[in-house]
Design a protein with these regions (language model features):
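C-terminal catalytic histidine-bearing segment of alpha/beta-hydrolase fold enzymes
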Residues: 270, 276, 280-335
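Primarily recognizes the serine-hydrolase "nucleophile elbow" in alpha/beta-hydrolase
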Residues: 209-211, 217-263
Length: 335
């Protein structure tokens, strides 16, 4: 009996270890897209300014910088594949970006004296010399760039329609992109949180236009909830930039008369009539103001739709709307 136990215990331990090991890669893959770098890790990264989806330092051209990092080590064939899907920017050999993957580059945000990350998606067939339309994507309250870029179907549309997607953090997860004013900081947050949140978006936009060939007539805004309110605020604040905007359950507050500054920007609005966080009445009032101003818009009210309904079901309409609404040449602003 003693001999049997001595053989049985190691065998059970070996089988258990094997099962845990086999399960581990699946867990890594499931978490890596949505787990963008944490703010406490934002200074980590290599000279390319990239960090991994798990907040670890990335090596340019390695698996650590893409959305399915940690799944397995590179083989020789994978290294070759990585090289083919990596775009070099400028003369710096380390300034490389993966194509067809959600990645999280970082940059030095001088106003906030802090290094911030943002989400970036280059379409699979990206060509550095080609000009592309751009969608600036804004996440909701307590969300992240990785979360909203992982909305099912979003990157697929970017591939099929050949869009670059960029998702700023907005300084932190609750900055409101300036839509609630320049302040709003709580506790240890900066007093000018709203201003920092807004300027993070504008700095990431500037950086993206510098790094890639962006069509100035086709720069769009898309946001959900807090990101929808932020999109409307940025459209009203910088109307010379945006060709069109698309908002889902927009948490938009403030004076609706400001919408007059964005009356030449077409808007695509989606709202659930059972939303308990952003009331349908509030969104209807914004849409009524659009009608009053003669603003080009489409309004889709989802019957029995809540706040977190299947927003991605509307990407077909959103991208069709974007395609149909480039900015007029005389309305283009300089970089």
């Amino acid at each position: 009996m003693r001999r049997f136990c001595s053989l049985f215990v190691p065998a059970v331990f070996l089988v258990t270890t094997l099962l845990v090991t086999l399960a581990q890669p699946e867990r890594c893959i499931a978490q890596s897209v949505t787990n963008a770098p944490q703010q406490s890790k934002d200074k980590e990264g290599d000279s390319s300014g990239q960090v991994s989806g798990a907040g670890k330092p990335a090596v340019a051209g390695s698996k650590a910088s893409d959305a399915d990092s940690g799944a397995k080590e590179n083989t020789n064939s994978e290294v070759k594949k990585d090289a083919e899907s990596t775009v070099q920017i400028g003369d710096d050999r380390n300034a490389r970006f993966k194509t067809g993957r959600i990645i999280f580059p970082t940059y030095e945000f001088e106003m906030g004296k802090k290094r911030l990350f943002y989400g970036l998606y280059l379409p699979k067939n990206f060509v550095k010399s080609k000009t592309y339309p751009l969608v600036v994507v804004l996440h909701g309250l307590n969300g992240s760039p990785g979360q909203i870029l992982a909305y099912p179907g979003l990157t697929k549309y970017a591939d099929n329609e050949e869009y670059i997607l960029v998702a700023p953090m907005g300084y932190n997860a609750r900055g409101w992109y300036g839509s609630r004013g320049k302040g709003g900081g709580r506790g240890s947050e900066p007093r000018n949180l709203g201003e920092l949140s807004e300027q993070d978006v504008m700095e990431v936009l500037k950086l993206t236009r510098k790094n890639f060939q962006i069509d100035p007539t086709r720069i769009y805004l898309f946001g959900h909830s807090m990101g929808g309110g932020g999109s409307m605020h940025l459209a009203m604040t910088y109307p010379q930039i945006w060709a069109a905007i698309a908002v889902i359950a927009p948490a938009a507050y403030g004076n609706r008369d400001r919408l007059a500054t964005a009356k030449d920007i077409p808007a695509y609005v989606v709202q659930g009539d059972k939303d308990r966080l952003v009331s349908v009445q509030q969104t209807r009032r914004w849409v009524e103001k659009m009608k009053e101003l003669g603003m080009k818009h489409e309004y889709i009210e989802v019957k029995n739709g809540g706040h977190v309904f299947l927003a991605w079901q509307h990407f077909d309409g959103i991208f069709s709307f974007f395609k149909a609404n480039p900015k007029l040449p005389q309305q283009i602003s300089p970089k």
